[in-house]
């Protein structure tokens, strides 16, 4: 009897104290804020967590393997990519090509070949029970083969069709209900939409083939990508299921959403708080951490200045202070290069959020009940903003035609039409009404994979 109890205790300890390697190479705050919350949850639950990251934090409860130089590399990549962008910042579906995305894949390869990661790989004493990889890069699936471990793919936002196909998703592609998240134009004819879907599928297949070739070059790995993908047992998607149009998925695909959200605080900046308390209707405008407003073409910037100066409301605008050197900014507009966005959105005087449509910004706006005007610029932002209008929680503006889109009119509409605020508050209640919070759900299903990895592989 004692031996049985001891063996059971050891088994539980093995599950609760697994060695987990997380590979999260994208040097973007919007990605890393999600992954950091997940990593912390794993560690606090008793797991030994090692993370390969280009953006280390001042923490000691996880082992961080810093992939050197990638932030600098990423900044240069963004800077050099302006040649493919419209109006200085816009990367729509026409820019999604194998050639354009190879810079990002090379960035990841650069990280994996960095000294610290190389040292990790050369240490033959390292053993991992589970690999958790960022979902959109297939190159890093090689860690599953290196350590002979099961893999969870984790997307900080929406998942791409190829992710669903990896875990056997039967509804990976549906150009009407579940369009490819790289699409930006949803007004085309049915035939044109199918052509765009096929084009994106082919470009991504070329990109995956190139990653396969890189693995042969960098690791001597001579198997095809399908064999690496066969180790993937679970897919985490960090958006609420309703935003992905309630896709019919199996148990090995789990929607999360908002796992980075922390309890908002009172705005601490006294100057900012004074401005916010003085004005009772405030529009907050931010295009996220990855977009520099000053990279927009001159006419775009001038139109934003015109609109913000002219509307009868106060404006908080995330933009570098150097904008004042070329433009006359009205006293109703308060500019800063950074805002405590979570806290700002929770202030009762914020009535409209002008956003690029990033997933994390959307989570924060929904949680705070602030209607949005989405001005998508790249990636999944176009699809995400499309959902604003479909769910009745905001409006969209085409940045390529900003001057004709009537941004000032749409701002006034959101301020005065209370249906947007009502809808977004209802949506927040609906999303929040779950038996388990998203971060705890992610932990439970991570442990589920650790407990049942052999059975999942057999019966998937």
UniProtKB/Swiss-Prot annotation:
MF-aspect GO terms: UDP-glycosyltransferase activity
CDD domains (UniProt xref): GT1_Gtf-like
Segments traversing the membrane: none
The protein's Enzyme Commission number: 2.4.1.-
SUPFAM superfamilies linked: UDP-Glycosyltransferase/glycogen phosphorylase
UniProt function note: Catalyzes the transfer of glucose from UDP-glucose to ecdysteroids which are insect molting hormones. Expression of egt interferes with normal insect development and block molting.
Protein name in UniProt: Ecdysteroid UDP-glucosyltransferase
Originating gene: EGT
